[in-house]
Amino acid sequence: FVGNVPILIALSWSGLIYMSLSCSFLISGIDITGIFSYSVIILCSLLVTILDVVLDPIAVDEGRWKWDLPGKYYGVPLQNFIGWFFNTAIILSLYNLIAVHDVPVESSSYYVKYAPAFLFILLPLIAARPCFERNLKSAGVIGVSFTLFLIVSSITSSL
């Protein structure tokens, strides 16, 4: 455990943050660099938090999460989402402080460069299916809508 969070969740979130960061660069139209602006940090933190809005109701329904004071959104308290937003922002801000600023980012094909972003775009849609199966309709609608938003945003940013 890291605090009250199982270590595997912390490790999986590092991957989600990485994919969300790639997606943030894709939809903002900002080139991927070794360091990034605070607007990218905020966007990435927001994207990860919205994904959590889709994922956490499933975890609660499966009995993997439980809070002493459950929230109104499928038992998930608001401070959970606020916490993930700020944890992501802090992690990325700390990375920016310690990152080597003169490391060139290798150029590679568009699809290789943004492969993590493409996976992130699909995750809310993938998570929406079990939401609908478990009658977590709001979470499912958010998942489908979020994927559609990310698809449209990524297409319009590359025009």
Language-model features and meaning:
Residues 1-159:
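Aromatic-rich, lipid-facing transmembrane alpha helices and their immediate juxtamembrane interface loops
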